[in-house]
């Protein structure tokens, strides 16, 4: 529960935290943000809202964040751009939409982005990822991305892995990313 999370601040070498359950709320994020060496955080099926994500902005060392089945929508995603050192982000079974992806555009250190099981994410949202030049891994599985959305990925020259299972991308859509010479997956 939230009150138990205060104990995490007493673990000076703690780097990875996985929290799940609806009894984890915004209040608990106050304590999580105070873990001095926090690097990776996984929030699965929690009740954390925009206020809780806003509290994480003081977690300077946070490089990896997973939001799985959490109450994450576009208004909550806007706080992610306050995490300038974030390198890996997973948005799984969230309420995020294409419009919400604009809040990721400033995450220039992002190297991996996994968005899956998100029917409200389509090609129009992919345009917001076009300037994430350090992106090496992008997963858009089980989204509404189609051929037209892939045109926005042309400038991601460091992209090595692109996962598109469960999308409406066809062979002709893949022509948009054919010039990405570092793609291996």
Where would I find each of the regions flagged by the language model?
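Concave beta-strand-loop units of leucine-rich repeat
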Residues: 1-185
């Amino acid at each position: 529960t939230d009150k138990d999370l205060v104990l995490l601040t007493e673990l000076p070498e703690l780097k990875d935290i996985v929290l799940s359950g609806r009894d984890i709320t915004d209040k608990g994020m106050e304590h999580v943000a105070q873990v001095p060496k926090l690097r990776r955080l996984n929030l699965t099926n929690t009740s954390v809202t925009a206020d809780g994500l806003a509290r994480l902005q003081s977690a300077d060392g946070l490089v990896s964040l997973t939001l799985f089945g959490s109450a994450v929508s576009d208004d909550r995603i806007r706080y992610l751009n306050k995490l300038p050192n974030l390198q890996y982000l997973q948005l799984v079974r969230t309420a995020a939409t294409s419009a919400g992806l604009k809040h990721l555009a400033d995450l220039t250190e992002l190297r991996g982005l996994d968005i899956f099981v998100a029917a409200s994410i389509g090609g129009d949202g992919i345009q917001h990822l076009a300037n994430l030049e350090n992106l090496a891994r992008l997963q858009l599985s089980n989204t509404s991305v189609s051929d037209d959305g892939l045109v926005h990925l042309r400038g991601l020259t460091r992209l090595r892995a692109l996962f598109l299972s469960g999308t409406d991308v066809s062979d002709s859509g893949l022509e948009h990313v054919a010039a990405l010479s570092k793609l291996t997956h």
